[in-house]
Amino acid sequence: MVLRDEILVRHVDRVPPATGRNNGHRSRPPAGTAPSTMRAAIDALAERRAVALAPADAAADRRHRAQGKLDPRSRLERLLDAGSFTEIGLFAEHRAVGFGMEDSHPAGDGVITGWGTIDGRTVFVFAHDARVRGGALGAVYARKLHQLLDLADSCGAPVIGLNDGGGARIQEGIDALAGFGGLFARNVRASGVVPQLSVILGSCAGGAVYSPALTDFTFMVEGIGNMFITGPDVVREVTGEQVSREELGGARRHADTTGVAAFVAADEQSCFDEVRDLLSYLPSNNQELPPRQWSGDPADRRCEALCDIVPIDDRVPYDMRRVVAEIVDDGEYLEVHESWARNIICALARLDGNVVGIVGNQPAVLAGVLDIDASEKAARFVRMCDSFNIPLVTMVDVPGFLPGVEQEHAAIIRRGAKLLYAYCEATVPRIQIIVRKAFGGAYIVMDSKSIGADLSFAWPSNRTAVMGAEAAANIIFRKQIAAAADPVRRRQELVREYERDLMNPFVAAQRGHVDDIIDPADTRSVLIRSLALLAAKRAAGPVRKHGNIPL
């Protein structure tokens, strides 16, 4: 048996000295004499494949590993089911000339493409190889990605991209730029058709950032993943600002501040585990339902702890995540954008084994108020769920939209409308649960019946109104309070009157805006029965090209 290293040495020995620069990349082996038998042809193929699979640049490989990063093939092995990967495009090579390009033709051209399985389900994958010209994209590299996305679109399977590259290959000029354009167009065409996941495992700079930005979910690994359109050197040259790569576009920055990263992991293996976990909640394409996984958690299980988790006084905060955990199967859920816009929660979970998307105000952060970031975070999540046939459950405890000059000038009118638009357009089953306060326009936006929720239920702690009693009293009873002999006492009386007449738990139900007032302990069983009913829901919108969402 011939060892792979022996094959590699044999081929390297055959290669004549290259002329010009080769940047340390191993040149392709010469074609040689045509094999005389099939067996000889198979042996030649094995030798050629061994060379193609070996690192093209030993020095670049050492530098890559010194950063604590896995090589791209090891990444695919850890992400996919064992032995499931099938590669295409292994022998693809660039055809560029000039700038020393003709002296080096690494097999694969810097990107690995193919398909495999995760939990037995087909996925298409690509992995940038940062050891080949920094992972920069050229024309052939791009063509491999185009083919992969076309196959995923045709076969109806998710696409996972392991990103570790430096943008367009400068030496290939406009051909590289056109390659990115073709990639972006395919990302958009596949949007809402098959799940697209981007994993940032190194640099993702310049035009390269827009492909992950167009996909459904972006994962980043702390310490090695970073994303920016212009790097620290350009920022310093143009603006004079001093900033590190991590501060400018590191994983924590995009998870906490920009919302670009939906998930952040401490290391690559943890990241791959999260990718696999997320896929377990998603269908392979928009014509399928998410996979059902029944855990044995009884559908009629009462959630008695909810009465202790949620205080009756709507001024007292609590953690909505505890409410979600109490209701869903086995208390398990996957939160999306956990550290961005923390005043709203977006999570994937299961009820009676069926996947649901949960949107909930978070009273523990900013009292659960809706602001720009919360609106955009929830809007994107709602649209993702609607794209992939995931029913929506909305847990409401909202005092309104966040007031202030900063929010108004940052366009909360337009950007807050995104959540309203997303809910109104969604055709999946939609159920609203009013936990406590539901005030003003924010109540409407949080999937009220008036904008199309299929069913609305409220707890006896609900207080639904245009605004809270204290604020309302200052407006509608202003003259009466001012004319009173004891304004403080009169104001308190009028506040209680407002609460009695307009904020009692039964007003919304009496007027048909809520379908029932339920015991909080029955929330799980009510949701499961309602979702079973709505599984047969059919909804068709008007004939149109597309709506004009307030982007």
What are these regions (language model features)?
Residues 2-551:
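Ligand-binding clefts of soluble mixed alpha/beta catalytic domains
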